[in-house]
Amino acid sequence: MQRAAKCALRPDLSVVFCPSSVRNCRAVNRVNGSVLCRRYSVLPPPRDEEEKAMLDRMLRVDHAGEYGANRIYAGQMAVLGRTQTGPLIQVLNHMWDQEKIHLEKFNEILGEHRVRPTLLLPLWNVAGFALGACTALLGKEGAMACTVAVEESISEHYNSQIRTLMETDPERYTELLQIIKEFRDDEIEHHDTGLEHDAESVPGYFLLKTAIQIGCKAAIYISQRI
């Protein structure tokens, strides 16, 4: 009880960055399979300004990506949640719940290490929701095509970060690598789920997928820098 009280009284820096759906004072440590009402460091202190800049860019864009993914699922559910899509709603909710965990973890890390989120969060808020809603208007196949395109882009981006950290100092970044690898695996699972639910059957699939992925790459590039 004392520990819970102390945790409840501790200022929660993540509220600066997180949407209302993310719970305060609740960090999810999925690597260890437990829910902890505490903050703990997954990053060592940066050795120099160059390392700090690298980590800031990495965390900023990861947070932006997970924020955007949450808004996409929100847009999809706003449309499909009112239709008779059957089991797909459970599938979307499962994937969205995982994205909420991802976002919550990056909220925690940004708050702890005083990393500024991208200034474009208001834009990604609107753009993500609009993308989710518009693709859902194409039907469940359109929503799944969006999922495939976005999750493929995010998993490739996470793979690039994993390579960078492995080449830099894997022992120094052990915990961060664990988190990114687990989140990468979730994104791959979402990608495969989209394919299993007829993503490729939407008219103009490859054109739609290409357009979405161009947007994702642009968002990644901009969010690292602004």
Spans of features found by a protein language model:
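Non-heme di-metal
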Residues: 2-226
